[in-house]
């Protein structure tokens, strides 16, 4: 799922432009929930729509409010440092990455216990 604070049309357009929409069953926007980030509602809504308990979810976040929302939802957070977001307070993260490199993707896969040979 994608659970973003951005308006739904922006999320959808971005995913379609990057040809990524086909990889996500659920796209949830902060404007679709009563309390957007840093409240947990966006993540809880995405998990509910997926039919997945929050203890089986993981969040990859690049904003302080998103990290706070993940913590409030009791979902582990992988922190993706975004140099374009200014000085962000890094939330309690189970893993930190600084770029979408092969090495960092492998770190995430290892953390999630994915067998990369089967992916």
What kind of region is each of these model predictions?
Residues 4-6:
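Conserved phosphate-coupling serine/threonine residues in phosphotransfer and NTP-handling enzymes
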Residues 1-2, 79:
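Hydrophobic beta-strand core positions in alpha/beta domains
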Residues 8, 12-119:
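Asp-based, Mg2+/Mn2+-dependent phosphohydrolase catalytic module
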């Amino acid at each position: 799922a994608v659970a973003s604070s951005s308006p739904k049309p922006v999320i959808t357009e971005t995913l379609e432009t990057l040809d990524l929409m086909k990889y996500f069953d659920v796209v949830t926007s902060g404007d679709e929930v009563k309390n957007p980030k840093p409240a947990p509602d966006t993540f809880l809504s995405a998990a509910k729509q997926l039919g997945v308990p929050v203890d089986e979810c993981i969040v990859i976040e690049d904003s302080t409010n998103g990290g706070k929302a993940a913590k409030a939802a009791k979902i582990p957070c992988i922190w993706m440092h975004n140099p374009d977001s200014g000085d962000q307070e890094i939330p309690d993260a189970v893993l930190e990455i600084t770029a979408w490199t092969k090495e960092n993707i492998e770190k995430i896969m290892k953390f999630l216990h994915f067998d990369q040979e089967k992916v």
